[in-house]
Amino acid sequence: PLYSSAASDVYKRQDISIITNIELDHEKWLGSTLEQIGLQKAAILKQGKIGILGSDSMPLSVTSKSKEICKKTLQLGKEFRVSSQNNKWSYSIPHKNFELEDIDSGNLNHESAACALSAYKMLLEDDIDFKKVIEATHLPGRCHSIEHFILDVSHNPASVKNLIQFLDRNHKDIKFNAIFSAMSDKDCESIINEISQYISEWNICSIEDTRFNISELINITEHITNKSVVKHDSVYSAVERSYHEKVPCIVFGSFITVSQAYQAIEKIKKENHEDH
């Protein structure tokens, strides 16, 4: 109750609402079309406040709602812009006469970072080194590199595309083993199809969740790819094997998978340190 009260209070006092993008996910609760999901997400927009939209192809249910109730709407591709080339990206918000160029990509999603920049520029005029701040910002669980592992909580086709963009920028022409577990209510076929060409071996891990079915996931993976598929009774088992083999490895598919992989890596590193 205390958390709910605090969260509700923050919502009531917010000056800016940000909707980064709309993709098919959590259809059971949000709806089966982008317009339906957009309508649900648009509920965070506040009357008389600022709405920031982080996609140039937002559903009409979002853009129309924002224009209807927000005092100002900023949308990617219109009121602020992003461009990228190689390992750099640039940002501009013309009506504020502000732009940044040649920002190191890091592991941040460019569009989401641009939303945060736009929000800051709408609230404050502080003269700070934005480029330095952005390049020093790191999100755990998003394209996070630890030794020869890349951990990413991507669990739908859209977020996997962001992971692929990161791989193309930073690890071009490298093949990875995958440590992968995704819930049965996700679009597993599309997820696997998107990233399959980057994967040499699939390690499918069992996780304790009523939405998870390892036999079904293995069948889908074997049907889509012609790569080796290895079954593990835990994320720890897959991480331990990959850790000692020192093969480049991507961990993705769910928050649970990545969380357990973080724990496994830390435990194995600690054990190895104690042995030496």
Report the location of each language-model feature:
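Nucleotide phosphate-binding/pyrophosphate-handling subdomain across enzymes
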Residues: S8-I18, I22, K96-E201
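Acidic, Mg2+-coordinating active-site environments of NTP-dependent enzymes
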Residues: Q14-I103, N109, A113-I128
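Cofactor-binding loop segments of dinucleotide-utilizing enzymes, especially the Rossmann-like FAD-
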Residues: N21, D56, F180-S184, S206-I207, ...
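General small-molecule cofactor/ligand-binding pocket signal
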Residues: K72-G77, H144, I150, V230-H232
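A glycine-rich beta-strand to alpha-helix segment
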Residues: S237-E266
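Short, flexible loop segments at boundaries between secondary-structure elements
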Residues: E271-H276
